[in-house]
Amino acid sequence: MMDVVDRSWDMAHRPRVALDVETSLVYGRRILEGVSRYLRANRPWSIYLEQHELGSDLPGLLKRWTGDGIITRQASADSVKQLKRRRLAAVDLGDIHPHLGILRICSADLAIGRMAAEHLLERGFQSFACAGFSGEYWSQRRREGFIGEVTHAGYECSVYESPRAGLKVWKQDQKRLVEWIRALKKPVGVFATNDLRGQHVLDACARENVAVPEQFAVIGVDNDELLCGLCNPPLSSVIPNPERIGYEAAGWLDRMMQGDMPTDSLIEIPPQGVSVRQSSDAFAVPDPVVAAALRFIRERACDGASVQDVLDHLRVSRSWLERNFRKLLNRSPQAEIRNVQIKRCKELLRTTSLSLEKIAALAGFEHPEYMSVVFKRETGDTPGHYRGSNEKEL
């Protein structure tokens, strides 16, 4: 957790800080919310901010700014040289140029890809695909995380990539997307490396009359509620943590303007979880009874449901359920219950300040001590250490 800057430091001087962060995208606005939250708790700055899109030049703000510091999403090798020449405190939040020699704070893209894979694997998918953008570092890293997790589980992954471009290329791209979708083995779980790509994929599915999510489950990234809601069906999405990125960036810039330089050149902020919407809300198992068991466990595990409760609900024998779970999912019903409970624990540890006793109750454990034992066994980490490493509020 970042140390809070002493509010008494030179209150007569408000540092002049430029915020070169796009206001046209939800991600950028949430970064600015994190900066704002930091400033409300610490000394104020004199802020220079213009509304603009990612990629606009402002013009040439990075080359012309002569204030005390800058937070930017658009750093380049050339602009960083000039910032260093002027000895200007700077934090880079961009996801295009990864190695510029200044502090970079960004989303943990590998972890985002892994989280998307876990979401689809938990739903029983055994065929996987990834749709991203060529030439985009962040998309490449998310793809790597997704494929790595899928490969570790023993499966392969088909990849579709194309450049980010305008309407003319988009029309050609949609045609190729339809052809790619047509060739995939179904049912298939598809990871789109951002919500915009997820919208492209769902639109292509509609053109091909593919059943979503039963035959083609899709998950994106960014949790842009407007864009996800415009999709048909609504798009599931991995939730990054741009507010924390903004908070961290403001804190580090404040310290740097006081001469405290960071020892690390990269800080990666993990995702918060998955917002499940209709596009991936399905279980890709051929047996309807096993699918019903999975849905029951998802809905009731955190109420304390046991394997016996599953058996009573479905009216099947324990041996039948155990055998078919292992055949179709390669895990036991009890392991599935624990998996759902641990995911709930992680979510509450990351995003709330609730006590372990309260978290245990909300995750379906009778005692916090037993929850801690199970959490340590399943994750290799204690609840307290996990919370300290992943908490949303700093």
Where are these regions (language model features)?
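Bacterial carbohydrate/catabolite-sensing allosteric modules
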Residues: 1-69, 78-307, 311-313, 322, ...
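Residues that mark the N-terminal boundary/hinge immediately upstream of a DNA-recognition element
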Residues: 306, 332, 355-357, 367, ...
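A secondary-structure capping/hinge motif
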Residues: 325-333, 374-386
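Binding-interface segments
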Residues: 371
